[in-house]
């Protein structure tokens, strides 16, 4: 294991705990007399202007669309390294998280529809449990970081990022009312420029980040989730330079402390404050929250593990070294933490309908994600190697 990865795991252990603490603080504030202060903080207007271009958004969206793009940049860098040189190198190993992610989207959606398919309003939320909150899933795993094999963490990263990309496509196809073709065209041009820079051997990460910032603006204006820009830039920054140094690893090393100690805890604080006003005991067993919760803590592991197991048995994919099927199952349960991505889809699915749909969908997401987090953590403790 490289020194950078060792440092990353150490950072995550502390950062994961900080993430959970800030999430709890946010949940308390959102359901207490401090709710007003919490909402005022998230709704602070932040404007950035460059010539004729102006982006004016509340702080919450700057955190979710802007700062989280940096997190996804690091995820892209790490997954690329493992695909080229690490535990996912080779077609059969690289296919493994792809197949797992497909199962992790299909099964929860089907289970949700078993509960809600007959209701014309609630069935619009079929994609809610398809999402995995990569930040919170990593945060829980980070609590056991010294025992987690690098290969298992990379599997979670790869699976979750493919899952998120799939959800972004779902949002674009089924939940985006207006898409700017001009902005999409400019996004494609920026991606082409990044590909050309990589092909020409440009090694300066500052050049990639500059083009990446423009790409981020273009994707934001297109109506597609802007964090996609971070993944794209991460995959296109060169892994190895001409003199043997690694531009991508140097960038990872510089950004990791900021992500672990600032960006992810701030993200948790901004998004975990789910207000539960108007919730009743009878509503807890309604088909909407129940369908979401069951789809997350049961559908996710069912889909991920079954698709993974079958792909291995038929020889279509190969289990990465140093990890076993018990650990894969534990991680698949952890992927049931849908949380912020699920809440985002919920807002799109039930936009313009009665507020109770939004309240009870958030409740279902909170229940399912919490159960998945505790179950996933408990299973990981059981199946991971003991400390030496």
From Swiss-Prot:
Pfam families, alphabetized: Na_H_antiport_1
TM ranges: 8-28, 33-53, 59-79, 95-115, 125-145, 154-174, 179-199, 217-237, 259-279, 287-307, 328-348, 363-383
GO biological process: regulation of pH
Highest taxon of the lineage: Bacteria
Keyword terms: Antiport, Cell inner membrane, Cell membrane, Ion transport, Membrane, Sodium, Sodium transport, Transmembrane, Transmembrane helix, Transport
Family from the record: Belongs to the NhaA Na(+)/H(+) (TC 2.A.33) antiporter family.
Function: Na(+)/H(+) antiporter that extrudes sodium in exchange for external protons.
Protein name: Na(+)/H(+) antiporter NhaA
Organism annotation: Photorhabdus laumondii subsp. laumondii (strain DSM 15139 / CIP 105565 / TT01)
Lineage: Bacteria, Pseudomonadati, Pseudomonadota, Gammaproteobacteria, Enterobacterales
């Amino acid at each position: 294991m490289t020194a950078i990865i060792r440092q990353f795991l150490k950072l995550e252990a502390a950062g994961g705990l900080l993430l959970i603490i800030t999430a709890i603080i946010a949940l308390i504030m959102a359901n207490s007399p401090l709710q007003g202060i919490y909402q005022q903080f998230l709704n602070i207007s932040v404007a950035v202007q460059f010539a004729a271009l102006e982006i004016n958004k509340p702080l919450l969206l700057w955190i979710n669309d802007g700062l989280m793009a940096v997190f996804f940049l690091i995820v892209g860098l790490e997954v690329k390294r493992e695909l080229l040189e690490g535990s996912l190198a080779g077609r059969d190993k690289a296919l493994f998280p792809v197949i797992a992610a497909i199962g992790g989207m299909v099964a929860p959606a089907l289970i949700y529809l078993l509960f809600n398919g007959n209701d014309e309003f609630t069935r619009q939320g079929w994609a809610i449990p398809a999402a995995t909150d990569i930040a919170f899933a990593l945060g829980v795993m980070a609590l056991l970081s010294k025992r987690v094999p690098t290969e298992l963490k990379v599997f979670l990263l790869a699976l979750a990022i493919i899952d998120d990309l799939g959800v972004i496509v779902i949002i674009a196809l089924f939940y985006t009312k207006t898409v700017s073709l001009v902005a999409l065209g400019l996004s494609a041009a920026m991606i082409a420029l990044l590909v050309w820079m990589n092909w020409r051997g440009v090694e300066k990460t500052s050049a990639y980040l500059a083009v990446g910032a423009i790409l981020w603006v273009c994707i934001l204006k297109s109506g597609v989730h802007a964090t996609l820009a971070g993944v794209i830039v991460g995959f296109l920054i060169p892994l190895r330079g001409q003199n043997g140094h690694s531009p991508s690893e140097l960038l990872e090393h510089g950004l990791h402390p900021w992500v672990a100690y600032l960006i992810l805890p701030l993200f948790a604080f901004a998004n975990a404050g789910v207000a539960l006003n108007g919730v009743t005991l009878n509503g807890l067993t309604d088909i909407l929250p129940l369908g979401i919760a069951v789809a997350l803590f049961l559908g996710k592991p069912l889909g991920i593990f079954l698709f993974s197991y079958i792909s291995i048995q038929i020889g279509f994919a190969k289990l990465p070294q140093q990890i076993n099927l018990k650990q894969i199952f534990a991680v698949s349960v952890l992927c049931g933490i849908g949380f912020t991505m699920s809440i985002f889809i919920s807002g799109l699915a039930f936009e313009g309908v009665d507020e109770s749909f939004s309240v009870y969908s958030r409740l279902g997401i909170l229940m399912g994600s919490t159960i998945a987090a505790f179950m996933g953590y408990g299973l990981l403790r059981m199946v991971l190697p003991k400390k030496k």
